[in-house]
């Protein structure tokens, strides 16, 4: 796949045609949380407590992530593994290589969501550049940038209109 836009992500969620990997980062906290919530809710519809493990990346190992990914879904079609703030670059080159291999071998019944809330992704650094490139090759990368003023006006106007309220742009 590749780096995708907000519209492409929302279309995947609507059509329920998911990638095996979502790599979500960026400066807009609201968008990151919104996308993760929408993905998780849409992927796992049965027994979320069993099919949607949440892993705190600060205390996680690649082995733990791998173990969760390779478990089969229980009484559900899909399993969603959510990993927050896993700083693989700080773990070293060997961990980066292992993670890249893991990205390429995610089972069809599992969706891995890696979201970075406090870990800063600097694509200029070679470690993160390789990880983002591998994520892009094997799944979807979403960079949650702040919206421009024009985009915000359009978003808020549309949001209000759906709720029966009209907002004047002046």
Model-derived segments and spans:
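Conserved beta/loop motifs at nucleotide-recognition and modification sites
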Residues: 1-170
């Amino acid at each position: 796949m590749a780096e995708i836009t907000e519209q492409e992500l929302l279309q995947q969620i609507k059509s329920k045609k998911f990638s095996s990997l979502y790599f979500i980062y960026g400066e807009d906290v609201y968008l990151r949380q919104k996308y993760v919530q929408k993905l998780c809710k849409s992927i796992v519809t049965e027994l979320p407590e069993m099919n949607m493990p949440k892993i705190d990346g600060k205390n996680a190992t690649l082995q733990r992530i791998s173990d969760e990914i390779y478990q089969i879904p229980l009484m559900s079609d899909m399993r969603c593994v959510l990993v927050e703030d896993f700083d693989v670059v700080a773990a070293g080159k060997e961990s980066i290589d292992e993670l890249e291999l893991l990205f390429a071998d995610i089972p069809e019944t599992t969706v891995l969501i890696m979201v970075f809330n406090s870990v800063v992704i600097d694509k200029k650094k070679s470690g993160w550049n390789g990880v983002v490139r591998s994520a892009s090759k094997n799944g979807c990368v979403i960079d949650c940038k702040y919206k421009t003023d024009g985009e915000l006006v359009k978003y808020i106007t549309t949001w209000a209109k759906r709720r029966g309220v009209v907002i004047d742009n002046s």
